[in-house]
Amino acid sequence: MVASPHIAHFFVTALQQRCSVITNPANGETVIIDGGGDSDRIIQWIDSGIGQADDEIGSFEGERKVVALINTHAHFDHSGHIPYLKEHYSLEWWLHEDDFFLQSLAQESGRRWGFSLPEPAVAENTWKHGEVHTFADMEFEIIHTPGHTLGGCCLRLIVDDGPDHLFAGDTLFQGSIGRTDLPNSGGDLELLLRMIRERLWPLDEDTIVHPGHGPLTTIGQEKRTNPFLNDGFRGRG
C-alpha cells in the first residue's frame, strides 16, 4: 500500500480523456495510466517539471521515474500515444488480453475521428480479474468490468491512510456509464451494468473514482444518484 500518493491528471486529445500520472512520494516512482495523447507535454512535465498538470491531488517535490505504463482499455483516445511513451521510457505495456485485438484498430479508429496516430503499440503484459499488481511500490487491484470493451478494467489503487482511488476508464462516470454502441469493441449494456453492480458497488463508498472523462466522483455518490444504475433502468442489450 501507499501513503498519500500524488496524482496528476492531464486531459488529452479533443475528447478530453483523463491520463493519470501517479507518483509514490516515498521514492518518486511513477505510473502512467491511459496515455492516450499529449505525450510530449506529459513527458516534459514528468522529466523536467515544465508546464502544469490540469489538476493534482496531493503534493510531491522531487524527481520522478516512470516505471510502468498501464491501461484501463485500448480505445485510441486512451492508448494512442502509448507508442511514444514506451519508446521514451523503454517500458513494456500492461493491458487486459481481451482488448489486445483493439490495439491494431487504434490508428484506423483515430483517423475516423480526425486524429493522426503512430503505428499501434503492442502490449507485452496482461492481467486477470482479482489480481493485485505492484507498480512503483503501489498496489493496484485489477477489476475486470467488460461491457464498454471486452477487456475494460478498473484499477483500484490501495491507499493505507485515506480513501482508495479507482481509475475507472470508460466504465463509470459521474452520473453516467460508458458507451456500449461503439463498433468493434464488444459492447454489452446489460453486462456493463451487471459488472458495475457486482464488482464496483461493494467497494468502500468513499473510494474516489477517476473516470476516463469528466469530473471525479465517489462510489457512494454514484450508488445513490447515477440514473443508469437505479432500479428503474434495466438497459437493453
Q: What are these model-derived regions, one by one?
A:
Residues 2-51, 62, 155-169:
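Conserved beta-strand hairpin/beta-sheet module of binuclear metal-dependent hydrolase folds
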Residues 54-63, 109, 132, 138-144, ...:
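Metallo-beta-lactamase
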Residues 6-8, 92, 125, 139-141, ...:
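Conserved beta-strand segments of alpha/beta enzyme cores
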Residues 38-41, 47-135, 163-164, 224-234:
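Active-site HxH/HxHxD metal-binding segment of metal-dependent hydrolases
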Residues 1-6, 111-115, 136-140:
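Short Pro/Gly-enriched beta-strand edge/turn motifs at strand-loop
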Residues 10-12, 122-124, 144-148:
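Short Gly/Pro-enriched turn/cap motifs at secondary-structure boundaries
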Residues 29-33, 68-71, 142-144:
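Short catalytic-loop micro-motif centered on adjacent basic/acidic residues
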Residues 33, 94-95, 168, 211:
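Hydrophobic residues in well-ordered beta-strands that form the structural core
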